[in-house]
Structure formats: C-alpha cells, structure tokens
Amino acid sequence: MSGRLIGKVALVSGGARGMGASHVRAMVAEGAKVVFGDILDEEGKAVAAELADAARYVHLDVTQPAQWTAAVDTAVTAFGGLHVLVNNAGILNIGTIEDYALTEWQRILDVNLTGVFLGIRAVVKPMKEAGRGSIINISSIEGLAGTVACHGYTATKFAVRGLTKSTALELGPGGIRVNSIHPGLVKTPMTDWVPEDIFQTALGRAAEPVEVSNLVVYLASDESSYSTGAEFVVDGGTVAGLAHNDFGAVEVSSQPEWVT
C-alpha cells in the first residue's frame, strides 16, 4: 500500500465484521490508526488482535451517546486526535407497510439514523481542534430509490443522505468534509440471505466489501479534499437504469417501432 492515510486517526462504527471490518483493514493498510466499535465484542476483539497496535476495539452501541463519547476519547487518548469518522453501523428489517411493527420502525430509525447523528455530533469537537476532518456516512442505493418492503431501511438511508448535506454545509468552514456512500448489494453477513441476482446490475454481480472500502479510503484521504456534501455510488450500475438483459437476444430488424 502507498500510505495514503499516514498521520490520520479514524473511528468506525459497526467494524467487527462485514463491510465495517473491511473498512478498518483497508484504512490500517494505508497507514491510519483506527478505533472501531460494535456490539459484537468477540468478533471485534479478534479483528483488533489481527491488526495489533494499529487498531483499538471498543464496545459501541450507536444509539447510546455516552458510548460515542467513550469511543472518541479512546481515539484521542490512544492516538492523539481524530480525523475520520465512518458511520457504518446499520441494520435491515423488512415487512409490508400494513404489517410493519412500530417497534421495528423505531428500532431501525434509532440505529440507522439517530446512530449517524450521534456519531457526527461526537466527532465535531476533535475535528475542529484538528482543523480538518472527513465524515463518511454509509447510506445505500435505498437512499436514492425505494425498495418494496424495505420501508424503514429506505426512510433511514434517504435521511442519512439529507443529514450528510446539511452537516456538510455547516461544518465546511471548519475544514470538515461530509459525504455519503451508496452501496448496492454487498456480500456481507447482513445480506447473505439475499439472492445475488435480486438486482439486475450492469456488472452482473454483487460487490465485495473491499470495493466499498476502496472508496472509504479515498474519502478519508486528502485526495478527496474538495469533495463534500456529495453522494458516491458503488452499485455495479443498479441505479443507472433498468437492465433489460433479454433485449440482447432480439434481432435489430425484428424490433417493433415504439411510439411514446
């Protein structure tokens, strides 16, 4: 690796497995020091042991303000500051609008939206003190377009997209950038029950976690120094349009004339 993040300290939520663990490893590989949190303590401790002195694991329930404060304090105490936040933690639940329980709705808002808000709020002070910062909010393509039966997930991911923009405007004068990443289907433990071909993507496959992590590294680095309030899509072409794969088998001469 080329040391693109040397001198930076990052905090990652939901970092014990899946995309979060991939983000942690990718940033450490580029020279960052990383504090990462999760509620999956055994898995988190295993990742921390693998990365040795470059990383610290903390228990972090993103719905709890005090645990965010403790995570930030760990970063500042252990590594001398904080420059990057990756709001990665999230959950998915599904159900028809008629049957979707209020408790499920409230739970997903607490984790996917309030958790992001609390994370942003917790890192502003140390980032202002550093005179710079990069906040990376992991949204989803469901933050760009709706999906049937994913009502809470879609609502929270749209909201994260909006929160990204309002905080980018507020924090920009302090040198703090805020951007959102919108992955499509990614191969993680959270999505291992989802058929890989559920979306017709231009590339014809789901993403590997590292393909999202590569973008996280870019946004954490100074290479993205003029990017803020923006949406970065990593979806294999899912939201580019409908992939009518059967059209390729139709002879051009046999296509009817369509009138709109």
Curated annotation (Swiss-Prot):
Binding site for NAD(+): 17, 19, 38, 61-62, 88, 153, 157, 186, 188, 191
SUPFAM superfamilies linked: NAD(P)-binding Rossmann-fold domains
Domain of life of the source: Bacteria
GO molecular function, one term: androstan-3-alpha,17-beta-diol dehydrogenase (NAD+) activity
Family annotation (CDD domains): 3beta-17beta-HSD_like_SDR_c
Catalytic activity: androstan-3alpha,17beta-diol + NAD(+) = 17beta-hydroxyandrostanone + NADH + H(+)
EC number in record: 1.1.1.53
A Pfam family of this chain: adh_short_C2
GO biological processes: steroid catabolic process
InterPro entries attached to this UniProt entry: NAD(P)-bd_dom_sf (IPR036291), Sc_DH/Rdtase_CS (IPR020904), SDR_fam (IPR002347)
Active site: 153 (proton acceptor)
Gene3D superfamilies (UniProt xref): NAD(P)-binding Rossmann-like Domain
Keywords tagged on the record: Lipid metabolism, NAD, Oxidoreductase, Steroid metabolism
Pathways per UniProt: Lipid metabolism; steroid degradation
Self-association state and partner proteins as the record states: Homotetramer.
PANTHER family: 3-OXOACYL-(ACYL-CARRIER-PROTEIN) REDUCTASE (AFU_ORTHOLOGUE AFUA_6G11210), NAD(P)-BINDING ROSSMANN-FOLD SUPERFAMILY PROTEIN
Family indicated by similarity: Belongs to the short-chain dehydrogenases/reductases (SDR) family.
Functional description taken from the UniProt entry: Probably involved in steroid metabolism.
Protein name per Swiss-Prot or TrEMBL: 3-alpha-(or 20-beta)-hydroxysteroid dehydrogenase
This protein's encoding gene: fabG3
